[in-house]
Amino acid sequence: MTLKKRSSAPELPTSLDEDEEEDSPQPLSNTPFFSMKNLIVATPIILTPLLYGYNLGFVGPYSTMYGYASNCQLYSAKKSCETLTAAKCRWFNASTYVSNTTYGEVCGWADRTTCFLKYSDEAGCLSDSACKWSYSANTCGNQVGYSSIQSGVFAGSLVIGSTMGALMGGYLTKRLDYCKSFLFIGLLSVIGNVLTHVATGLFHYWVLFVARIVLGFPLGWQSITSSHYTDKFAPANHAKTLGTLFQVSVSTGIFVTSFFGLVLGNTIQYDAASNANTMGRMQGLVSVSTLLSIFVVFLPLITKDGYSKSRRGDYEGENSEDASRKAAEEYTMTQMIGPILNGVAMGCVTQLTGINANMNFAPTIMSNLGLQPLVGNIIVMAWNMLATFCVIPLSRRFSMRTLFLFCGFVGSLCCVFLGGIPVYPGVTKSDKAISGIAITGIAIFIALYEMGVGPCFYVLAVDVFPESFRPIGSSITVGVMFIFNLIINICYPIATEGISGGPSGNPNKGQAVAFIFFGCIGVVACVIEYFFLQPWVEPEAKMTDDLDGAAVPEGKHD
């Protein structure tokens, strides 16, 4: 094959990275970014992550509301006290319980110690397993809501299902194609939410645990299917930006949960002569997720199948010969060890830097820093959502790799030097200074995470693999990320409480150690990824063979 004839052979794209695509001879779509065509293509990556985000942000508000529903001490009217269903409460005169008291009629526990009446000193309070001492208020109170172990298992239950869904998502999507996949994702989500309604009505913890696992499976599955669908059918010049909508939708869903949590949880009338209806409020929080699941069931009406087609073939007029050649470029698991290890490192940066500790336990963290739990929660989630929208213009200016590494590295430093070291007891003298520095550190970390790490992860989870290996590769990458997520969700509340010295210890100690750990992991992972993280590029020899095959044989010119 002569040089002249080689130059006439069709040139193949070598990378899916933005910087490489600029020189690609593939025709780009003239479709404007804000168009009905792009909206239809992006609907799955908007709706299904919105459902995922809502349930990701569900743990904090739901747990806080359960704490309100099981805390008899909060209620100051007989009707609201005795109609509480999450705890056995009774209305009585305090003088019949203890002789030396300034309280009159109070709401206390019918089946265990009413700690705020019985104990006024720390030693007596800590001697009773039903009680805990508050160092901030210098009072004794009952253990209410979920324990640290229950909180961790509750937060982890969704992730258990999501991990299984993510690991199986590539295989299931390949077998079912897109329309049936979205249908089953919607139906399984509805089933999971119905079980959550049942668990809430019964106040049964283990039914809730099972319900969240069932719900987690389709939410993990959708993280593969929706990203792959958008990457497949989006125009080349909009694909990366549309891909970042996954994290934008997740953060929006988290904010929606915090909004409903604030509206439902902070409007309880503790002194009203009526039923506080805490169970109904918790059911209302679940019902939004149920409604979103029903919407997902109808996604097949606007989506289309085409799993076996090459990427963006419908938009860019790719011929069937090119498509079949790409589909035939199979890679073994051994050949993909490098990209898979890249995916593991990305999972470390995405989860082991502590984002879901902030998301799931934001009410507790903000309460420890002096804010009302649900108010602090919505502030965190609003900031989280606003920061995510910044990725849309940034993704059109910088590559996914640059955003991921820069934001991950700087965010990890914030964890150590703002969220960790200054919060450790004895380092900063003023409580107000501790709160101010820690909240600033958390805010900067969340902003950097949502402007780079989170949105770029789901794009890079596809881009680091060749096209034929993407369903399996992205499933492994997202599955590993969910495993790290599970570890954090279960271990964070247990570890921070243990490091702090138990339920009555100083929570700042455990929180500081956790954030220092998060930051160190993030810094190390980002340094490793700086040298190894690259979008997939076909090996030069393979590209040359493809070009030779596409050229006209010399004999046919003679």
From Swiss-Prot:
Residues 1-28 are annotated as: Disordered. It is a multi-pass membrane protein. The keyword Acyltransferase does not apply. Residues 60-152, 201-204, 263-281, 357-373, 424-441, 500-512 are extracellular. The chain crosses the membrane at residues 39-59, 153-173, 180-200, 205-225, 242-262, 282-302, 336-356, 374-394, 403-423, 442-463, 479-499, 513-533. One of its GO terms (cellular component) is membrane. Keywords: Membrane, Sugar transport, Transmembrane, Transmembrane helix, Transport. Residues 1-38, 174-179, 226-241, 303-335, 395-402, 464-478, 534-558 are cytoplasmic. This is Membrane transporter D2. It comes from Leishmania donovani. The lineage of its organism: Eukaryota, Discoba, Euglenozoa, Kinetoplastea, Metakinetoplastina.
